[in-house]
């Protein structure tokens, strides 16, 4: 098998190319997905397949990021030869064994990619199509019959008494009871006539639609079929004819019943309107008077409640403005205090740096003192040998004098640093006093804010009491509405079916009143929401005040810590002063020792002079004739 393929990108996988990893892709990716799709098609509840995109089963080589290696013709020939040789080796040692059903089933599942295909033939498709047509026809007939029956029941139950137009309502207003009864009778007759016409038109349309559907079904079923299915098609046509006859019979009987019921209903309505027109007119006038009184009461109550709520809302808004202003002032104070704290921290860092510099200078002075100690020991050794090396003693004296000058300058610098630190400590103490004053002022402001918050809470309690009063008024109005509804129910029991429209008018009026009540309830709920929002803002102000108090406490703690650090620095300064005093005492002691050494040197010089004065040598020269010079040295010891 020779394949001549061009070099293509690594992700391109043509369908006609042989790859090494096709079996791995099939068994680990495609086969679980195909099994999942088959189970979903059967309606089973199956978990989604786990596709191993990570290297959890040794499938790292099947990642899409890896390049796919293609085979050329020589590699395919080599692989086929190795496979044939391996097959020959296996056949030599092969023994036929009986497989278990489980292993056979697993082998079959592994060898196929698509499985469980249902049979699909022409006969089955034609049967399904015929069955589908028959079901559609039966559903259409059922829907038509149900619509006709529902329409008949609606006509029987609904007398069209509640369907008054707006123009008719306007024409009735302000008329007497007899005129209203006459108008209702004429309107009912018109409604009955229009209902009859609509019913006849609807029944005619349904009959035409059903006949068309039947003819369409027959034309479909009369299409040329195979010889073995024609008898079945004729049987279906006979069943369709029977169904159409039954439906026609049902429709005609239902129409006859509807006409008879409509005529009896018309007679009853005329009699009822004639008998009960007087009673209904009197009751209508009484109910109108009551409704007008209730409307006036409700309007007055609503206006009064609106005014009260508006006044309360304005008061709450003013209190909120005051609380917001106080909150802004507190925030400004907190910002100022935070800036002062940052300045204090910077000043503290400067003081700490200066102390570190003084400590470094102190360490240098200690090192110098150690050097001076060593030099003093050397001076003592030189003083012991002063009689032998006076010159060396003088040089060491000069060096000691220069070093003493350096120590005196260092001492002067330490004294100046001490004065500077004392000045800085006084500045820090003054800053601390200013911060404490500002803290007292902020505490006073916080107490004022707490008093104002208590006042706001008292106002909120008063608003809640007013809301309770409004709820009692609402309950009394609901009781009145219930009494009116009970009265209306009594009128409905005593009145005739023809007076339902008049009562419905009153019910509409009561519904309007109820709607107005609901609007008032909604407005009341909105006011309650506004009050809750105000309470939330008050709580937020309280929380902010608590946070401000916490911040003040933190500032106080920071100031306490700074004072403690300042005390520590004072102690360190006092210790440094003690050390500097010790160094000055040592320097003075060294000066005394040097003075004693100088005195010893002076005494040594004086003793040397005395010794020289005691032991003097005299040199005399004499000349002899003949140019000879004689030198005579004589020593004299002067004894006292």
UniProtKB/Swiss-Prot annotation:
Short name of one Pfam family: Myosin_tail_1
Gene3D superfamilies documented for this protein: 1.20.5.370
Tissue: Found in all adult muscle tissues except in indirect flight muscles and a set of temporary abdominal muscles. Not detected in larval muscle.
Post-translational modification: Phosphorylated.
Major localization listed first in the record, in broad terms: cytoplasm
InterPro entries: Myosin_tail, XRCC4-like_C
A GO biological-process term: Rho protein signal transduction
Keyword Phosphoprotein: yes
Entry keywords, A to Z: Coiled coil, Cytoplasm, Motor protein, Muscle protein, Myosin, Phosphoprotein, Thick filament
Described function: Paramyosin is a major structural component of many thick filaments isolated from invertebrate muscles.
Similarity comment text for this entry: Belongs to the paramyosin family.
Protein name in the entry: Paramyosin, short form
Species per Swiss-Prot/TrEMBL record: Drosophila melanogaster (Fruit fly)
Gene behind this protein: Prm
